[in-house]
Amino acid sequence: FMSDQTGKNVKYIWDPNEYINVMMFNFKSPDDSSSELLGISNMPLTVKGDSSLSGLEEINISSIKKSQLQYAYCSSINSKYINSESTRYTNKGKSSYQYQSTDINVTLAHELGHYLGLHHVFAETKKQNGYDYAETCFDSDYCKDTPSYNRKEYNDYLYYYLSQHSTGSSIDINDLTKRTNCDGETFESANILDYAVGLGYKISADQKYRIRHVLYNSPLIPGPKVSQGTRSAS
């Protein structure tokens, strides 16, 4: 749906300059992966010049009309998990916390974070059609206040930990949310731009700065803009 470049799916979205479009549909399960995609989002564009924001695709124009789009500019959520929630939203802390890695609230916050200019907090490298886990540990999200870590190493740790704890009662959520940053220090994963297993509720100050910058400067994003002249796509 989102990768189609023929323009046929643009009719399904409202004007991105006025609305953030969140599409709900059942994702096709990948044939080559044991995991299932929960959501996907377009990243915003940034205008070349003084208002350019690192980590985003640069363009020369400050205004784009919906009629000029060749693809559905939006965030998409896998509707298969629309009713999946961790118990922190339902029991108000009256009983023990039951974690759900497919929590729809976290997925939506995560994808809207991407839509407004945020990258994953773990180390990743850019490839032709997106990003992939990095082999080493470095800061790749353009936010100095979000500790980075090696996602591949964490996945290996997670797989080993779960294989050694076959019964659910023996699993400690604190062991699963633990990460090791590039300096070898441990921290708890709570940022919305991390993957499971994490608490998924924090946004850092640097991330808020990026979001504000996108809201005030990027085309195809609703809301008032900082004056960038009147140049637009023809």
Provide a role label for each language-model segment.
Residues F1-A109, Y115-E135, D139-C143, P147-S148:
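Metzincin-family zinc-dependent endopeptidase catalytic domain
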